[in-house]
Amino acid sequence: MAMAALTSSSSAITLLNKPFLPNRSSFFSSDSQSPLLRFSASTSVRSRFPSAAISAVAPKSDINKNETPKIEIEETQVFACPVCYEPLMRKGPSGINLQAIYRSGFKCGQCNKTYSSKDEYLDLTVTADLDDYNEVKPITTELFRSPLVSFLYERGWRQAFKRSGFPGPDEEFRMAEEYFKEAEGGLLVDVSCGSGLFSRKFAQSGKYSGVIALDYSENMLRQCKEFIKNDNTFDNSTNIAVVRADVSRLPFPSGSVDAVHAGAALHCWPSPTNAIAEICRVLRSGGVFVGTTFLRYSPSTPWIIRPFQSRILQSYNYLMQDEIKDVCTSCGLTDYEDYIQDSFIMFTARKP
């Protein structure tokens, strides 16, 4: 991102000819005298997302060992406000890992909405921190917000998918990795991640600059965090973040994500068209989307019962192969491919 140079006559920082930190002293300044501002722009070799960082440090003559360490403020290209899609300003340690995200605060410079980590996840929903309003989703979404279903998901629930033709997590992961080869080294978002079954696999592979485990269910994210904490292959440097967000309002800037994965998820979304349109928006040019779901009926389903089965399952967003392709292409994705096994379908498409 192009940045205007800092001038010696003003403490304002200008980004694309707009004030970067206008009148936000209460959120980003200390109680002591105004610090000097040091600007740096950096781009990671493995990441396509440059960031602007500002370090607030005291003048050299005032530095002593007892003073508070410098405060870092960053406009990140990873997260955006789910209300206005402006990049969020971040106060705290940098990095996409559990410890850094937990210790950071986020604020939108456009609408002034603030976001912070709960005990287990960063809440980037439009309804974050609302006290009196509780949004209820369709039953297919609300089911997975249940503590019981969230607990059982990797303890028997997911294993039952094999009866519908799902190959199993290890094989599904291997298949997805084949489609994601061109996205290696970039940012991967695992939408509707559930308890993080595939998010953990993607993070453990070490092939991505960051992995975002994203779900709307608070209890699924608690399970995700618990599995990560109990896995000794993860440490504070592992590039994985746990985020609560709505798939139809993804908290990422347009064109900023290299890969999106949605395992056994499409049939749970209130509006698959809205969700896939959002996925297309956040993908960069050439970015890859891979998803799996249940078909309304399998190729082996007797023709005589297909109309009845279709009538029942269509209301729960169980789609067919041609419908999934139509939704992807109508939302701007190209190069659609799929693989079908019984009622299981893995499909992929990319942003041109």
Swiss-Prot record:
Kindly list the biological process annotations in GO that this record carries: biosynthetic process; methylation
Q: What InterPro entries does the database record attribute to this sequence?
A: Methyltransf_11 (IPR013216), SAM-dependent_MTases_sf (IPR029063)
Q: Which CDD domains match?
A: AdoMet_MTases
Is Transferase a UniProt keyword of this protein?
A: yes
Taken from the record, one Pfam family name reads Methyltransf_11
- Note the Gene3D superfamilies from the entry: Vaccinia Virus protein VP39
Cystine pairs: none
Task: Look up the transit peptide and give its residue range.
Answer: 1-55
UniProt entry keywords in alphabetical sequence:
Chloroplast, Methyltransferase, Plastid, Transferase, Transit peptide
Q: Where in the cell is it found?
A: Plastid, Chloroplast, Plastoglobule
Primary subcellular site in the record, as a coarse category: plastid
Q: Which GO terms describe its molecular function?
A: S-adenosylmethionine-dependent methyltransferase activity
Cellular component GO terms, alphabetical: chloroplast; plastoglobule
Q: What class of enzyme is it?
A: transferase
EC numbers on record: 2.1.1.-
Say which family it is in. Belongs to the methyltransferase superfamily.
Any idea what this protein is called? Uncharacterized methyltransferase At2g41040, chloroplastic
Give the taxonomic lineage as stored in the record.
Eukaryota, Viridiplantae, Streptophyta, Embryophyta, Tracheophyta
